[in-house]
Swiss-Prot record:
A motif (9aaTAD) lies at residues 260-271. It comes from the Eukaryota. Transcription factor with sequence-specific DNA binding activity. Binds to the consensus sequence 5'-[AT][AT]CAA[AT]G-3', showing a preference for 5'-AACAAT-3' and 5'-AACAAAG-3'. Inhibits beta-catenin-mediated dorsal axis specification by binding to sites within the promoter of the beta-catenin-regulated gene nodal5. Acts maternally as a transcriptional repressor of nodal5 and nodal6 to restrict their expression to the vegetal hemisphere of early embryos and thus establish germ layer formation. PROSITE patterns: HMG_BOX_2 (PS50118). It is found in: Nucleus; Cytoplasm. One of its GO terms (molecular function) is sequence-specific DNA binding. This is Transcription factor Sox-3-A. SUPFAM superfamilies: HMG-box. The 9aaTAD motif is a transactivation domain present in a large number of yeast and animal transcription factors. Interacts with ctnnb1.
Amino acid sequence: MYSMLDTDIKSPVQQSNAPIGGPATPGGKGNASTLDQDRVKRPMNAFMVWSRGQRRKMAQENPKMHNSEISKRLGADWKLLSDSDKRPFIDEAKRLRAVHMKDYPDYKYRPRRKTKTLLKKDKYSLPGNLLAPGVSPVASSVGVGQRIDTYAHMNGWTNGAYSLMQDQLGYSQHPAMNSPQMQQIQHRYDMSGLQYNPMMTSAQNAYMNAAASTYSMSPAYNQQSSTVMSLASMGSVVKSEPSSPPPAITSHTQRACLGDLRDMISMYLPPGGDASDPSLQNSRLHSVHQHYQSAAGPGVNGTVPLTHI
């Protein structure tokens, strides 16, 4: 098929002398007739020579059959033919090709342009929608890249600003994390450092007091004897009043606790000896009362704990 450039190069004498593959439609438009005259058809092959008569015959027998279905049936029938049956059609195709080469020596087969479906697919693609019709795909891709670069510079942010922002917002270790206090907290579960918070409820205070009296790991508590630890556990069971333990226990407090322990043990001994003395009993009760007051401390919201129970 000749393009418009080839038809301009050809001389008008050759166009007038060249045979046309098909007659022009008499009632057609001028533009359609011009295209039919300019287009040079390919020479028919053996199958086309054979199917020309068979197609017409099959179309007359089956008027409602589609042309594509007729072509499928003709192709299957052509494959069933033997070489001897195909020979005359092959010879006719060779003769037509020789005549075509003689009439059009500079003929070069050029495939048809894209069909309407392919053009429609290109039209609804991304570059086709963004640009006006008639722009080449290379120019469309360049235009899309330029638009992306334009949006990247909006609001004062450059193309590399996002990476810089991520570097600036990266999580860095605070210098205070390397301090000895923080390392001590990280490597030790110290319950003695907890302080009383007025916003805590009574249930939370009771839980923290029980945990502090049972699982405390401060050096002052580690120096106590097993007797003092048993006293602390007994005090936590008997005394359910919420209180916070002191951060450290001095030697004076340890001696007081040992004295209170002796008094509490002598209270439950059978009467006799020194235990029957009323003055000793009063001193024991007074020491136990002082022990509960020192252990309880100020109550919740500054109220006096119920030590008389």
